[in-house]
Amino acid sequence: MNLSLRLPRPFLLAALCCLGLSSCIVRMPNPAQPKALPNQSNSIDSAIRESTVPIYLLADSLHTSLALPYDWLIESGYTPPANLKFSPGPSRYLIMSWGDRIAYEQRRWLRPTEVFYALCMPSPAVTEVIPVSWKVEEVCYQQRIYRREIPQSHGRPLAHFLNASNRFDAQGQPRVIGPSSWGQGVLVDSPHSYYFPRICNVWTAQALESCGFSINIRKAIHANSLIKQAQKQGFSWVHRGHAKSRYGRDAAKPRDL
């Protein structure tokens, strides 16, 4: 997703004003109500009692997404877009994120006016769904990647949240509006509006929350703030990525490095 934040000063001032107006509606409506996730100190005991699955948190300079096991999502009740095609490979994951429709559809940097309207005015949003059949670290090698095992039973509230992020057609299938910004995935129409501060990282934060994590949504607007919350709850940094900005791979180092 391409989103340039180099705005003229009037646009920046307008964005700050918009923050005050919209701060009370940061969340997506109707999030799933999960059960609490066990503390990391009890994760081994939890794994003995119940099978676990890996989930991945991905981040570049500003944007976050999730990589989730496809078969587990289906078993948990997630309704995928029709005709997703997985290439031959050892595993099946969906790379998923949410955001402004224009930003996902464009193949160029957004103009300042487009950024202004995307951030400050309620605009159409999409969920990007990309099937991959290989190691997440190798497919998304440019991004910082964090991994955590969670109980399989936490998939149902997550599937509920993911389904609620999509608009469905008359046949009960997610309404596909175009190809994904990369890979062989799709963009799915979302019923929720995009604006600041309800941005991509809020969607990611609420998805993690639906898995049972304790996330402060207002502190998750910036990618690094969300990552730090995830690390405190057991996400381990498994791939450094290749981001080369002060917001990139070194901006949210694990505490033990």
Where are these regions (language model features)?
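Bacterial N-terminal signal peptides that target proteins for export
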Residues: 2-12
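C-terminal motif of bacterial Sec signal peptides marking the signal peptidase cleavage site
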Residues: 20-23
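Long, compositionally biased charged/polar accessory segments in the mid-to-C-terminal portions
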Residues: 44-47
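Core subunits and conserved enzymes of cellular information-processing
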Residues: 25-28, 34-38, 53-54, 62
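Glycine-rich catalytic cores of cysteine/serine-nucleophile enzymes that process amide/ester linkages
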Residues: 55-148
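Activation targets extended, charge/polar-rich intrinsically disordered C-terminal tails
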Residues: 25-32, 164-257
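Internal catalytic-core helix/loop-beta-alpha segment
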Residues: 147-171
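Second-shell loop/turn segments in exported
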Residues: 140-151, 188-195
